[in-house]
Amino acid sequence: MSFVPYVIEQNSRGERSYDIYSRLLKDRIIFLGEEVTDVSANLVVAQMLFLEAEDPSKDIHFYINSPGGSVSAGFAIYDTMQYIKCDVSTICIGMAASMGAFLLSGGAKGKRLALPNAEIMIHQPSGGARGQETEIRIVAENILKTRNKLNEILAANTGKSVEEISRDTERDNYMTAQEAVAYGLIDSVVEKR
C-alpha cells in the first residue's frame, strides 16, 4: 500500500489540507513516479489540460522518475505535451527509462533537465504475441512500425539521425545525466534551482 502525505496550509479563511500531489499541482508541478500505464497517463494528461486551461502562458514542470511502460499510454502524454500551448519543462529525478526517457526528451527545447545523479535509458520497444502465424506477424509488424515512429521522434528531439537512434536503441543504452546532455536527450544538468 502506498502512502500519500498531506500538507496543511493556513490562510485568513482557516486551514486546508491537500494531498502532496494536489498541492504541487497548484504550483504547476506534475509528477510521474511510476510505470507509464493508461491510468497514470490519463492522470498526467488531465493535469496538463487543467493547467493549460488555468493559464496557457505559464510553464508546466513535469518531473519524471519512471521505468517506462506502455507505448500507447506514453504517446498520449507526449502528444498532449506537444498539443497544449504551455511549455512543458521536463525534469528527470532518479531514472527515466524507456518511455520515461522518451517523455523526458519531449519537453520544450532548452527546458529538458536532469538532476546530477539521474539515469536515462533508451531502447527499442518490446512486445509479445501468441496465436497463429498471421497474428504473430501482425503484432511483429506493428512493433516495427512503432519502433520507427519512436526513432523518428527521438531523432527530431535529439538532433541525431534515425539511423543513429536505431543503432543506439538496439539494446538497453544507459546514460548519466551528463551523457544525456551530450546525446541531446536533455539540455542541461541542474544541481540547484
From Swiss-Prot:
GO terms for biological process: protein quality control for misfolded or incompletely synthesized proteins. Keywords: Cytoplasm, Hydrolase, Protease, Serine protease. It is found in: Cytoplasm. This is ATP-dependent Clp protease proteolytic subunit. One of its GO terms (cellular component) is endopeptidase Clp complex. Fourteen ClpP subunits assemble into 2 heptameric rings which stack back to back to give a disk-like structure with a central cavity, resembling the structure of eukaryotic proteasomes. GO terms for molecular function: ATP-dependent peptidase activity; ATPase binding; serine-type endopeptidase activity. The lineage of its organism: Bacteria, Bacillati, Bacillota, Clostridia, Lachnospirales. It catalyses: Hydrolysis of proteins to small peptides in the presence of ATP and magnesium. alpha-casein is the usual test substrate. In the absence of ATP, only oligopeptides shorter than five residues are hydrolyzed (such as succinyl-Leu-Tyr-|-NHMec, and Leu-Tyr-Leu-|-Tyr-Trp, in which cleavage of the -Tyr-|-Leu- and -Tyr-|-Trp bonds also occurs). Coiled coil: none annotated. The active site is at S98 (nucleophile), H123. The gene is clpP. Its EC number is 3.4.21.92. Its main location: cytoplasm. Cleaves peptides in various proteins in a process that requires ATP hydrolysis. Has a chymotrypsin-like activity. Plays a major role in the degradation of misfolded proteins. Gene3D superfamilies: 2-enoyl-CoA Hydratase, Chain A, domain 1. Belongs to the peptidase S14 family. It is an enzyme of class 3 (hydrolase).
